[in-house]
Amino acid sequence: MFPIRNTVPTRYPPVITWVLIATNCIAFLFEISLSPYELEQLLYQFALVPARYSEILASDEINPVIDDVLPLFTMMFLHGGWLHLILNMWTLWLFGPTIEDRLGHSRYLAFYLTCGVVASVAHIFFNPVSIVPALGASGAIAGVLGSYMRLFPLARVVVVVPILFIPLFFEVYAFFYVGFWFLMQVLQGMLDLAVTPTRADVAWWAHIGGFVAGFALVPLIVQSERRYRAYYRDEGVLGFDPEGRM
C-alpha cells in the first residue's frame, strides 16, 4: 500500500512542513555535491553511529559534548539517496500539514524534532554496536504518523496497491493503514535483531521509537478543545479527538 492522499482538511498554510521539506532537500543536494571521501566524513560526523555512543557509555567519565549530541538531530536531515529522500518527503507532505494545523507551528516543530531524537535513541538502544551510519527523516515522520493515527483514527487515506502491474486505488481508515505500517516495522525490526544483531542496514527501531513517541506525546501538546473553531469540531466523522483519546 502506498499513500497518495490524506483526506483530512487543513485551514492554515503548513509553513513548518514546507521548511522541513526544503531543509531536507537542500541538505541532500549538498550531500551529492561532495566527493566520496567528503561524504563519508560528513556521514560519520553528522549521521548516527550507535557504536560511538556505546563507547561513551562504557567510559568511566560521561562528558557529552556538542559533537556527540548533534547527530541525534542532524541525522534526520540527511538521506541515503533520491528514493530515500522522495519517499520520506512525500509522506511528510501528505501527513505533516494535518498535524501542524492541529498543533500550531511552534509546537509542531518541537514535536517533530522530539520524535526524531527519540527515534535516534531507540536506534542506539537496539543496535548499540552498529558502526553503520543511520540517517533519514523516517523516525521523525513516523512520529507524525503515530500522532495522525491517534488524532484521526477514522480518517480516510487513499492508497494505491499494484496488483499484476495494475494500480488499484482504495480508501482505507487511518488506523488500518498506519497500524499495518507499524506492524511491518515491528516485524522487520524483530527479524533484523535475530538475523543481523550487530548490523542495522535499515533503522527499523528508529521508526518504531519515533512512532511510539508521536502516538504518546501528541495528546500532551495538542491545542485544547476550546481553542478549536467549529471547523474542527465538525470533524467527528474522522474520529478526531483534541485530547487524543482512542
Language-model features: locations:
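A detector for small-residue-rich transmembrane helices and their helix-helix packing motifs
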Residues: M1-M246
